[in-house]
């Protein structure tokens, strides 16, 4: 499969580990443009609700691109212009989990998606 195909794209997920801090992403799958996908990130090894959390992505052959952030309490959210109105970031501090709901997906959303802490 080539990334240039206009009818499907792959959103891949990697696991990120840094010392005792662990962020494990899940939810990657092949989706048709116009479809929806929800990514999850399970955090451990730090006090999750003390931190602003981010989603970043890396498209094939490109550098890292910041996607979105959410404040420690979920009260403030910010988005890159490229995803504004289509993506929604959320968190559940009781589950130490971060989410990214992605709607109206486009071929240019094809990337590796990572969660990150401040």
Curated annotation (Swiss-Prot):
Residues 45-52 are annotated as: Complementarity-determining-1. GO terms for cellular component: extracellular region; immunoglobulin complex; plasma membrane. Residues 20-118 form the Ig-like domain. Residues 53-69 are annotated as: Framework-2. It holds the Pfam family V-set. Disulfide bonds join 41-115. Residues 20-44 are annotated as: Framework-1. It comes from the Eukaryota. Keywords: Adaptive immunity, Cell membrane, Disulfide bond, Immunity, Immunoglobulin, Immunoglobulin domain, Membrane, Secreted, Signal. Gene3D superfamilies: Immunoglobulins. Residues 1-19 form the signal peptide. Residues 78-115 are annotated as: Framework-3. It is found in: Secreted; Cell membrane. GO terms for molecular function: antigen binding. Residues 116-118 are annotated as: Complementarity-determining-3. Its main location: secreted. GO terms for biological process: immunoglobulin mediated immune response. PANTHER family: IMMUNOGLOBULIN HEAVY CHAIN. Immunoglobulins are composed of two identical heavy chains and two identical light chains; disulfide-linked. V region of the variable domain of immunoglobulin heavy chains that participates in the antigen recognition. Immunoglobulins, also known as antibodies, are membrane-bound or secreted glycoproteins produced by B lymphocytes. In the recognition phase of humoral immunity, the membrane-bound immunoglobulins serve as receptors which, upon binding of a specific antigen, trigger the clonal expansion and differentiation of B lymphocytes into immunoglobulins-secreting plasma cells. This is Immunoglobulin heavy variable 3-43. The gene is IGHV3-43.
């Amino acid at each position: 499969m080539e990334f240039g195909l206009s009818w499907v794209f792959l959103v891949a997920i990697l696991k990120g580990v840094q010392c005792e801090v662990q962020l494990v992403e899940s939810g990657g799958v092949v989706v048709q443009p116009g479809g929806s996908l929800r990514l999850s990130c399970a955090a451990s090894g730090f006090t999750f609700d003390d931190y602003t959390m981010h989603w970043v992505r890396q498209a094939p052959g490109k550098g890292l691109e910041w996607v979105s952030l959410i404040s420690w309490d979920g009260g403030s959210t910010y988005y890159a212009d490229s995803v504004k109105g289509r993506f929604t970031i959320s968190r559940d501090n009781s589950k130490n989990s971060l989410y990214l709901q992605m709607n109206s997906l486009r071929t240019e959303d094809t990337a590796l998606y990572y969660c990150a802490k401040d």
